[in-house]
């Protein structure tokens, strides 16, 4: 049963997430794994991946060293199994309700508990939960996970769908798959299948934590704070609380901040799910500001539900109060595209980010801290989470909240049409709802964007000529269903105050100057167009959401993956760490325009770094000079997922390139 309870609260602040109950037991130790039904069991790390567990056990060599990547493509063709034997903690064993929570499984996984089927998963971008109240033993429990090959499962899904899809970034040939690009048929990080800056290392495994949780009669499931109107004078807010209980009972709801009770009201619950709506107002709120505009003020609140004076459920939340919107308004020059924070138009100084590692569980909290502080210290105020990676860890968004970094959040779709059969749409719907609910309380979240470059691809990348009319029409239909219907409907339902952008870019195309007057632009003229950097002075869009130029990482990074015998642009190892087909040629060609091309490899690497920094500073300063016509400059890209020749300003080991230093100057 569902019951809606409306509480009028006199004063309250705002929220983002951490709870006291339920009781939690982490299940991260004493795992073992092996290839399915083959060989002996080996120790495993959880969270982890099959690849990293094989590395840790000495079964394979470092995939990042020299050209080892090509020697381990067999891993993604096999099934793998993980097993844990555990006992339930005494305190948790006494709870009435118990569930297993899998925060991230990559990707196709069949789960049993004590021999009983529990779940079959098909999406790495969401949490999976299972009620295990009647399945747990008071002695030893056996949790077993079988990960199906993402390649073989992808082939099955492709055959069921019955239509080919481009997925040009899927390095299927490198993986021994010929033309079979299966990445689009699994809800799995696209970049794992390869990109023009990344290797093909298609992982499986428990990539986020698993835990057992238990509670008795009452559990606060979620708290969401909507901010219908926030001004320096007053913030009108609305808190929505979802809780489950077994009983019809009267409770006292209290809202606290700094141990002070801000609101107190009686709540009458019914068995099942209950929803509480709490409207409230704050006078003269301390507003949240982006980096460079002011302080990123945050409030921490606690909601307590009490029975007979005792706290029976609690949820603590932190967020900031602000008005943040994307302004798209027709003007005499076309249509504006800028972010407005607390009534102030903001020039977005920022960058596109990819995942910090191919092997996601390797990314630590300190890695995220360095990522966000490096952006803030370079005077940035925005990071775009690009649609070919992952929805980032909660801690990343918490850091952006603290440092005043606005987040442009893509849904995880990039550079290719996608299926739109009912089963696929169901997976996408569940993924979207989960991540919208998970992230919507973050003050830093500026907007949702449906995809990266798919509409541009449909219009300009030759798919219409390459494919039969009926297949191309299916691609158009799939785009319409996913990005014009399903995703905007979910944003409207679960995060109604946030702007949804269909795709990036939508109107503008770097080869068509007449289109730059509307929307955001990805200008790849200085790379794929092989134009000089000076063209950035005149090719000015309303908002530059991608532009870039490659460089080598510095020599100390190259030494981690190559030996001196490999120090040649045409060596097999250097080519293995250069995923752009024109990359090394174009770096050398452009260097010859602006500088003398050194003969010594180490000098060539150094001058490549100088070249990248010079060219990209040229673009950033041109965008800022053309304010307010142009209101954003987002570099491609911030970081790397392995040691590689790429467009990044910070290499895999965290070293700033010349471009990042030039960014700090250009954005000052």
Regions found by a protein language model. Give the residues of each.
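Extended carbohydrate-recognition surfaces in non-catalytic/accessory domains of CAZymes
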Residues: 19-101, 180-209, 213-218, 235, ...
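N-terminal carbohydrate-binding accessory modules
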Residues: 22, 304-306, 310-375
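Accessory beta-strand-rich segments of carbohydrate-active enzymes
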Residues: 23, 27, 34, 77-219, ...
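Short glycine/proline/serine/threonine-rich loop/turn segments at secondary-structure transition edges
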Residues: 93-96, 136-140, 282-298
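Beta-strand-rich binding/interaction modules
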Residues: 111-113, 234-268, 276-278
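Conserved, mostly hydrophobic/aromatic
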Residues: 115, 210, 299, 343, ...
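Substrate-binding/catalytic cleft of secreted carbohydrate-active enzymes
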Residues: 382-402, 406-575, 611, 615, ...
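Aromatic-rich peripheral "rim/lid" segments of glycoside hydrolase catalytic domains that contact
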Residues: 634-668
């Amino acid at each position: 049963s569902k019951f809606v309870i409306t509480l009028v609260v006199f004063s309250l602040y705002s929220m983002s997430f951490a709870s006291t109950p339920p009781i939690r037991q982490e299940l991260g130790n004493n795992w073992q794994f092996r290839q399915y039904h083959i060989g002996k069991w080996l120790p495993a790390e959880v969270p982890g991946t099959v690849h990293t567990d094989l590395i840790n056990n000495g079964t394979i060599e470092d995939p990042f060293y020299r050209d080892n990547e090509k020697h381990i493509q067999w891993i993604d063709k096999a099934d793998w199994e993980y097993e844990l034997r555990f006992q339930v903690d005494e305190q948790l064993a006494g709870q009435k309700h118990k569930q297993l929570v899998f925060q991230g499984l990559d990707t196709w996984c069949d789960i049993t508990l004590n021999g009983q089927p529990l779940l079959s998963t098909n999406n790495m971008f969401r949490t999976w939960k299972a009620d295990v109240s009647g399945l747990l033993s008071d002695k030893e429990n056996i949790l077993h996970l079988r990960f199906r090959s993402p390649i073989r499962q992808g082939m099955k899904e492709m055959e069921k769908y019955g239509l080919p899809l481009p997925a040009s970034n899927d390095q299927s040939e490198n993986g021994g798959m010929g033309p079979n690009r299966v990445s689009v048929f699994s809800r799995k990080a696209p970049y794992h299948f390869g990109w023009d800056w990344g290797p093909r290392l298609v992982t499986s495994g428990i990539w986020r934590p698993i835990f057992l949780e238990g509670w008795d009669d009452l559990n606060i499931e979620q708290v969401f704070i909507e901010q219908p109107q926030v001004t320096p004078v007053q913030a009108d807010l609305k808190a929505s609380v979802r809780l489950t209980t077994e009983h019809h009972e009267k409770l006292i709801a209290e809202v606290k901040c700094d141990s002070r009770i801000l609101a107190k009201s009686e709540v009458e619950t019914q068995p099942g799910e209950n929803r509480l709506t709490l409207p409230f107002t704050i006078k003269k709120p301390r507003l949240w500001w982006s980096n460079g505009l002011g302080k990123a003020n945050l409030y921490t609140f606690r909601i307590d539900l009490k029975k007979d004076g005792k706290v029976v459920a609690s949820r603590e939340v932190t967020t900031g109060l602000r008005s943040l919107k994307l302004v798209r308004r027709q003007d005499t020059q076309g249509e504006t595209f800028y972010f407005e924070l607390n009534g102030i138009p903001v020039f977005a100084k920022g960058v596109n980010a990819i995942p910090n590692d191919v092997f996601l569980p390797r990314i630590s909290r300190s890695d995220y801290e360095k990522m966000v502080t490096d952006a803030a210290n370079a005077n940035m105020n925005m990071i775009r989470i690009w649609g070919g990676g992952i929805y980032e860890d909660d801690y990343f968004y918490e850091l952006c909240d603290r440092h005043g970094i606005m987040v442009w959040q893509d849904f995880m779709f990039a550079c290719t049409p996608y299926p739109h059969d009912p089963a696929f749409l169901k997976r996408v719907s569940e993924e979207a709802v989960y991540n919208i609910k998970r992230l919507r309380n973050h003050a830093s979240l500026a907007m949702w964007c449906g995809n990266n470059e798919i509409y541009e691809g449909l219009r300009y990348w030759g798919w219409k000529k390459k494919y039969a009319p009926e297949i191309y029409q299916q691609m158009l239909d799939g785009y319409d269903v996913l990005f014009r219907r399903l995703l905007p409907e979910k944003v409207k339902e679960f995060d109604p105050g946030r702007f949804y952008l269909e795709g990036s870019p939508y109107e503008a195309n770097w080869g068509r100057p007449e289109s730059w007057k509307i929307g955001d632009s990805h200008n790849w003229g200085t790379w794929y167009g092989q134009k000089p950097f000076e063209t950035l002075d005149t090719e000015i869009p309303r908002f530059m959401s991608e532009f870039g130029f490659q460089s080598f990482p510095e020599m100390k990074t190259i030494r981690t993956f190559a030996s001196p015998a490999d120090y040649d642009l045409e060596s097999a190892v250097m080519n293995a760490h250069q995923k752009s087909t024109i990359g090394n040629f174009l770096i050398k060609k452009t260097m010859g325009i602006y500088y003398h091309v050194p003969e010594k490899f180490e000098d060539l690497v150094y001058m490549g770094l100088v070249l990248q920094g010079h060219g990209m500073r040229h673009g950033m300063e041109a965008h800022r000079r053309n304010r307010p016509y142009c209101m954003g400059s987002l570099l491609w890209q911030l970081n790397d997922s392995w040691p590689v020749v790429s467009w990044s300003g910070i290499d895999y080991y965290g070293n700033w390139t010349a471009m990042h230093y030039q960014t700090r100057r250009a954005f000052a």
